[in-house]
């Protein structure tokens, strides 16, 4: 198995490029991305880059496979992982919202979401006796078809909701991209991570 000076976990998709560029600007010598089928980028002794699904980034960082990662706050709210979160990077802004069909005011008995842990906590805090249905595809469809009385999902512009004929009832949390750091790595690789964190704070204005 190859050994690296530092391993970075980044989410695939729209957040990847911005995360990659901001880490480069902060002075991290990231490897070039060689192709979509490459699971691990980097040369032995250098910086390695893992391209992961959003929900997998906190897991890889928490378990020490990667020392640092970038992921949305929405994912962190659902993950339950004990990670150091030193920098709000500011991009990838969205919100987690409660969504229903127009005019629906009845009790919520079933909620569909990609964020089951966050949603379960919300229901418990509010004393709502509702079931949580975890889905991975088009969450809005669950409300449109009546599979669920409400959905908890990410909203950016609201265009998707309007197109589906749904309404945003309540904003539950705001989300942006965050730098996350493995707590043990923060101690063991302090000489590398401390200046990187400081530079990212300067770049993000946080």
From Swiss-Prot:
Task: Please tell me where this protein is predominantly located.
Answer: cytoplasm
- For whether the record's keyword set contains Protein biosynthesis, the answer is no
EC no.? 2.4.2.17
**Record protein name field:** ATP phosphoribosyltransferase
InterPro entries in the cross-refs: ATP_PRibTrfase_cat, ATP_PRibTrfase_CS, ATP_PRibTrfase_HisG, ATP_PRibTrfase_HisG_short
Q: Which family does it belong to?
A: Belongs to the ATP phosphoribosyltransferase family. Short subfamily.
- Which reaction equation describes what this protein catalyses? 1-(5-phospho-beta-D-ribosyl)-ATP + diphosphate = 5-phospho-alpha-D-ribose 1-diphosphate + ATP
Q: Which UniProt keywords apply?
A: Amino-acid biosynthesis, ATP-binding, Cytoplasm, Glycosyltransferase, Histidine biosynthesis, Nucleotide-binding, Transferase
State what this protein does. Answer: Catalyzes the condensation of ATP and 5-phosphoribose 1-diphosphate to form N'-(5'-phosphoribosyl)-ATP (PR-ATP). Has a crucial role in the pathway because the rate of histidine biosynthesis seems to be controlled primarily by regulation of HisG enzymatic activity.
NCBIfam families hit by this protein: hisG (TIGR00070)
Q: Which SUPFAM superfamilies match?
A: Periplasmic binding protein-like II
Q: Which HAMAP family match?
A: HisG_Short
Q: Where in the cell is it found?
A: Cytoplasm
* Pathway(s): Amino-acid biosynthesis; L-histidine biosynthesis; L-histidine from 5-phospho-alpha-D-ribose 1-diphosphate: step 1/9
**The keyword Transferase is annotated on this UniProt entry:** yes
A GO biological process of this protein is:
L-histidine biosynthetic process
| Gene behind this protein | hisG
């Amino acid at each position: 198995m190859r050994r690296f000076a530092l391993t970075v976990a980044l989410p695939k998709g729209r957040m990847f490029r911005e995360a990659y560029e901001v880490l480069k600007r902060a002075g991290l010598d990231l490897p070039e991305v060689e192709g979509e089928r490459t699971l691990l980028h980097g040369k032995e002794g250098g910086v390695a880059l893992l391209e992961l699904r959003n929900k997998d980034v906190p897991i890889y960082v928490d378990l020490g496979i990667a020392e640092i990662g970038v992921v949305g706050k929405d994912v962190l709210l659902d993950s339950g992982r004990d990670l150091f979160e030193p920098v709000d990077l500011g991009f990838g802004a969205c919100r987690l919202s409660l969504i229903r069909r127009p005019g629906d005011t009845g009790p919520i008995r079933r909620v569909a979401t990609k964020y089951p842990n966050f949603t379960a906590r919300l229901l418990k805090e509010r004393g709502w006796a509702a079931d949580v249905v975890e889905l991975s595809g088009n969450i809005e469809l669950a409300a449109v078809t009546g599979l669920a009385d409400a959905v908890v999902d990410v909203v950016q512009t609201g265009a998707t909701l309007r197109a589906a004929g749904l309404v945003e009832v309540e904003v539950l949390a705001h989300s942006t991209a965050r730098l996350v750091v493995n707590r043990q790595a923060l101690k063991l690789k302090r000489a590398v991570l401390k200046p990187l964190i400081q530079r990212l704070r300067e770049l993000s204005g946080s």
